Amino acid sequence: MTQITVKALSEEIGTPVDRLLEQLADAGMNKAVADHVSEDEKQKLLAHLRKEHGDATGSEPTRLTLQRKTRSTLSVNAGGGKSKNVQVEVRKKRTYVKRSSVEDEATREAEEAAMRAAEEQAKREAEEAAQRAAEEKAKREAEEAAKREAEAKRMAEEKAKRETQAATQPRSDEEKLKQEAARKEAEALKRRQEEEARRKAEEESRRQLEKVRELAEKNGERWSADKETVGDMQENTDYHVTTSRYAREAEDEADLHEEGARRRSTKANKRKMSSRDDNQERDSRPRGGKAGRKGRINKPMSMQHGFDKTAVVAKADVVVGETIVVSELAQKMSVKATEVIKVMMKMGAMATINQVIDQETAQLVAEEMGHKVVLRKENELEEAILSDRDDKFEEVSRAPVVTIMGHVDHGKTSTLDYIRRTHVASGEAGGITQHIGAYHVETPNGMITFLDTPGHAAFTAMRARGAQATDIVVLVVAADDGVMPQTVEAIQHAKAAGVPLIVAVNKIDKDTANPDNVKTELSQYNVMPEEWGGDNMFVHISAKQGTNIDGLLEAILLQAEVLELKAVKQGMASGVVIESRLDKGRGPVATVLVQSGTLRKGDIVLCGQEYGRVRAMRDEVGNEVEEAGPSIPVEILGLSGVPAAGDEATVVRDERKAREVANYRAGKFREVKLARQQKSKLENMFSNMTAGDVAELNIVLKADVQGSVEAIADSLTKLSTDEVKVNIVGSGVGGITETDAVLAAASNAIVVGFNVRADASARRMIEAENIDLRYYSIIYQLIDEVKQAMSGMLSPEFKQEIIGLAEVRDVFKSPKLGAIAGCMVTEGVIKRNAPIRVLRDNVVIYEGELESLRRFKDDVAEVKNGYECGIGVKNYNDVRVGDQIEVFETIEIQRTID
């Protein structure tokens, strides 16, 4: 047995020595580099690797090849009376294939099905033959009865005719009476014969029907007993149809059934069966074959009558979940998947057999095919776990949640900054709030929770999320700037959420301030001040100097008293995720605003598709807290992943059920997203075919918080045009990793980091692959540079600019160049290699290029305005006096994204 060392084996198979030693150890063989490896150990390692890669049957070879060598010596005559010995080697190679039990089972089932089909065919043919025989007999008896009746009628008519002839020559009254009596007697005899014939026919048909019923009952009992016997024998007998003997027997048996059926049909067609008893006796005898063969049961081949029942397709109820695969829907309706696809195409939707469709589409398709649909609710567990809460406590007053909204640089963060007596605005990049900040402050009149939302257009989704979680909206409007687009959006969000609006007119300390103009502009959007008869409070403030900030707080608390805000302080907490991010040292971090109950350290929290136990809680200044009540924002640690901003955070009892609900939500989100992506209508087919002409700018986006990722991705996607499409191939929260760099290299994308940086391994990968990496801290710069990159991908526009015009004064003939136009340059300059147009009566009649440009018989590169020259137009000789020659050049204009 050949043995080689571990090092030699690693060189032979091209695997590092360390990796090979690990694989040997996993297979249960501890080896060193210098140890030997036998063939058995190689096979053991190979079987382990196959099993590890998913090939569970890899250790059992299904094909065995045997090679044999036979050596012999042959004596050959070499001539001259000498002989020499020749070594002869005979090589034989034989391959044995192990057939799987599944194939054996399939073969046996196929043969059994063939046998059953042959038996059914024979039984059906026998029934048809018996039925035909009964019909022939009844028909024959009816014909005989009709013949007898016709004969009796004919005899009666002849007798009556004779009597009539005799009656034409009456001789006396006595003879007349005799004739009348004879006629009546003949009529009575005729009626008795008809009644007797009808009675006999009825008795015969009744007797036939009774015998047929008895025969059917007797045969039915015997056939059921035979079927049970055959089933028991098939269960107790182990047929190895792969062996030659049993395969031959099964084939012979099938041939016998086929031959018997053919022979019976031939005999039935050749001659009529005259007697029902003979028919029954013949049908009850076994046909052909070896009756004594083991495992064979002789069965009756036919019966008299067959009873057919109309087959009706069963229309079962189809249970449809929120999403379903086309093949699964077809299986539930007991039809082929191609039929379902045809119906969907008729309804205007294209689908494949493995495509996921939504519940509404599946319902329409099933009802179109005549089935009753039962819609299944798949979130029963989710509803059960969310309803299992101990929130039956008394409601108490809570602090208002106030959202500061407004346009960019109108002073939102500065206003909140002055209230909290901190300087957060200076820490934000560019003085612009990049993500939601949640703070609660204590005032002399009570506690207020503030949410600071970004103001520029990219963060519309974040601002809408802030409006959903808030009680009062403070709209900050600069007195010197007035109403701006983001101001209008903030008003719309507040009205959509049904939240009362307080207007803070900021920057009133400036000389250009005009508060009345702000009121007038806001009144156009149904924001009316109280002094004008409206419902909105207007407060004039200056965030820079702190003017009337206390008045703003009083207005907020006054509005909160009117709203009578209450919440359950005890029990299991629920709230909303304001912001989320991935911290390098602490993992997923979510900012949660508690809306009811008390959130405690150690609670099990379910947030959208994520779950986990609260390991730590921090307030807005970073201090550890043990619990948080209503209207208190806290940062929680311990979730399984980064939840989406805006998800509902709920405390549940069971961590296992929370994991099930989170996994169900993740799977449902994936299925719905897949169904939305794969949906393709017939009317969009041609637009999908032409989509290959669109240039794509692939981007891998990483940001510090989830809200920034959503806002930036939405803004970049909106930049897409018909010619350039922005494709976000990957996005996430946290630093730029090596995985992001690999994704960017594979998809030819640029990597964009917003307030994040790349780690060392990612930087090495980016340098090696020459990937474009860009860092940003202000979203305006990010969007502008992406616009520039998209502009570079646009196909340029070309513009033709006229640079010179010459008038033809005379025409000369040249044997070498043809017609030469003697011209005077009237405008611009005539260049030698520029394209030209020939104009006649200000109409273009030819477009081409110059072949010759001369001045005083000298070739020149250009001729300026006011000089004469000779121009030869290439491939054009129809130049006339008075024509104009226009010289132009094509200029490329770079397009930009607006």
Curated annotation (Swiss-Prot):
Biological function: One of the essential components for the initiation of protein synthesis. Protects formylmethionyl-tRNA from spontaneous hydrolysis and promotes its binding to the 30S ribosomal subunits. Also involved in the hydrolysis of GTP during the formation of the 70S ribosomal complex.
UniProt binding sites for GTP: 406-413, 452-456, 506-509
Gene name per UniProt: infB
Gene3D superfamilies from the UniProt entry: P-loop containing nucleotide triphosphate hydrolases (3.40.50.300), Putative DNA-binding domain, N-terminal subdomain of bacterial translation initiation factor IF2 (3.30.56.50), Translation factors (2.40.30.10), Translation initiation factor IF- 2, domain 3 (3.40.50.10050)
Biological process (GO), any one: translational initiation
Residues in coiled coil: none
Region Disordered, annotated ranges: 51-302
Biased composition (Basic residues): 263-273, 287-297
Protein known as: Translation initiation factor IF-2
Occurrences of domain tr-type G (ranges): 397-566
Region listing for G4, in residue ranges: 506-509
Span list, region G5: 542-544
UniProt region (G3), positions on chain: 452-455
Organism: Vibrio cholerae serotype O1 (strain ATCC 39315 / El Tor Inaba N16961)
Alphabetized NCBIfam families for the sequence: IF-2 (TIGR00487), small_GTP (TIGR00231)
Biased composition (Basic and acidic residues): 100-164, 171-230, 274-286
